[in-house]
């Protein structure tokens, strides 16, 4: 479980998170949605311990984040940021193996190979990371996070992803979310991601959180949260919300 209680964070007189309280029990994919500047990435950084709130508290497995050591926290949660630049010309395999650093032990070769296959990175293994496309880099970073959290015996872990599909083609978007579902169901992973694609959230998320001006304005199942009234008010766009015939999830369409 991860929880946030009364999070407040201001920068240059602007509240980026405004009295945010949330509890995610785990065993689900959570999507945080909202327009640009809503506070989504700021909230994610607070939930992961990278940014201390001005007031309020975050807990992971009922323990305050500021009471975790950096090493132990890294074994229980992993974070993909929007941009992951490398200053040196590491190979893809070297970047992925960096995920084992908190464990102070090398990962088994067969497990690394398994994770690279899960993330469709095998063909990239010997490539220079800095020469990859944005989508290829996102796949490599996901593999690094899985190597960081992977244990022989599955145990509860948290995976935080900030716009993980921003550079992915449609095939790899589908592949990513199918993999995340597999990790939730088979490896006791819990996933929290910031997204801009409303239809991906509607199709794959178990829970949706809507943010506006630093506040959480809705939190619940996609079919309850992603309504035409709520989305029109939030984004100011002309849209129609239909029902996906395949799974009855919301289907958001831009009007002409």
UniProtKB/Swiss-Prot annotation:
<protein>
    <recommendedName>
        <fullName>Hemin import ATP-binding protein HmuV</fullName>
        <ecNumber>7.6.2.-</ecNumber>
    </recommendedName>
</protein>
<comment type="similarity">
    <text>Belongs to the ABC transporter superfamily. Heme (hemin) importer (TC 3.A.1.14.5) family.</text>
</comment>
<feature type="domain" description="ABC transporter">
    <location>
        <begin position="2"/>
        <end position="238"/>
    </location>
</feature>
<keyword id="KW-0472">Membrane</keyword>
<dbReference type="Pfam" id="PF00005">
    <property type="entry name" value="ABC_tran"/>
</dbReference>
<keyword id="KW-0997">Cell inner membrane</keyword>
<dbReference type="InterPro" id="IPR003593">
    <property type="entry name" value="AAA+_ATPase"/>
</dbReference>
<comment type="function">
    <text>Part of the ABC transporter complex HmuTUV involved in hemin import. Responsible for energy coupling to the transport system.</text>
</comment>
<keyword id="KW-0813">Transport</keyword>
<keyword id="KW-1278">Translocase</keyword>
<keyword id="KW-1003">Cell membrane</keyword>
<dbReference type="InterPro" id="IPR017871">
    <property type="entry name" value="ABC_transporter-like_CS"/>
</dbReference>
<dbReference type="InterPro" id="IPR027417">
    <property type="entry name" value="P-loop_NTPase"/>
</dbReference>
<dbReference type="GO" id="GO:0005524">
    <property type="term" value="F:ATP binding"/>
</dbReference>
<keyword id="KW-0067">ATP-binding</keyword>
<dbReference type="InterPro" id="IPR003439">
    <property type="entry name" value="ABC_transporter-like_ATP-bd"/>
</dbReference>
<comment type="subunit">
    <text>The complex is composed of two ATP-binding proteins (HmuV), two transmembrane proteins (HmuU) and a solute-binding protein (HmuT).</text>
</comment>
<dbReference type="GO" id="GO:0016887">
    <property type="term" value="F:ATP hydrolysis activity"/>
</dbReference>
<feature type="binding site">
    <location>
        <begin position="34"/>
        <end position="41"/>
    </location>
    <ligand>
        <name>ATP</name>
    </ligand>
</feature>
<keyword id="KW-0547">Nucleotide-binding</keyword>
<dbReference type="GO" id="GO:0005886">
    <property type="term" value="C:plasma membrane"/>
</dbReference>
């Amino acid at each position: 479980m991860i929880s946030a209680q009364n999070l407040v964070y201001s920068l240059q007189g602007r509240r980026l998170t405004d009295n945010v309280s949330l509890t995610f029990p785990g065993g689900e994919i959570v999507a945080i949605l909202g327009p640009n500047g809503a506070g989504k990435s700021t909230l994610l950084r607070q939930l992961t311990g990278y940014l201390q709130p001005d007031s309020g508290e975050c807990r992971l497995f009922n323990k305050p984040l500021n009471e975790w050591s950096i090493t132990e926290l890294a074994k229980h949660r992993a974070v993909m940021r929007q941009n992951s630049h490398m200053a040196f010309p590491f190979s893809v395999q070297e970047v992925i193996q960096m995920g084992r650093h908190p464990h102070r032990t090398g990962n088994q070769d067969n497990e690394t190979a398994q994770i690279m296959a899960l993330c469709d990175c095998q063909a990239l293994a010997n490539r220079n990371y800095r020469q990859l496309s944005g989508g290829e880099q996102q796949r490599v970073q996901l593999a690094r996070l899985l190597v960081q959290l992977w244990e022989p015996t599955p145990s509860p872990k948290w995976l935080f992803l900030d716009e993980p599909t921003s550079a992915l083609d449609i095939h790899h978007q589908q592949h990513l979310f199918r993999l995340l579902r597999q990790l939730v169901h088979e490896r006791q992973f819990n996933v929290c991601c910031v997204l801009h694609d409303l239809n991906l959230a509607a199709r794959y998320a178990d829970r949706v959180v809507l943010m506006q001006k630093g506040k959480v304005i809705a939190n619940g199942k996609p079919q309850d949260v992603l309504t035409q009234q709520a989305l029109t008010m939030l984004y100011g766009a002309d849209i129609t919300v239909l029902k996906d015939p395949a799974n009855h999830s919301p289907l958001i369409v831009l009007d002409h």
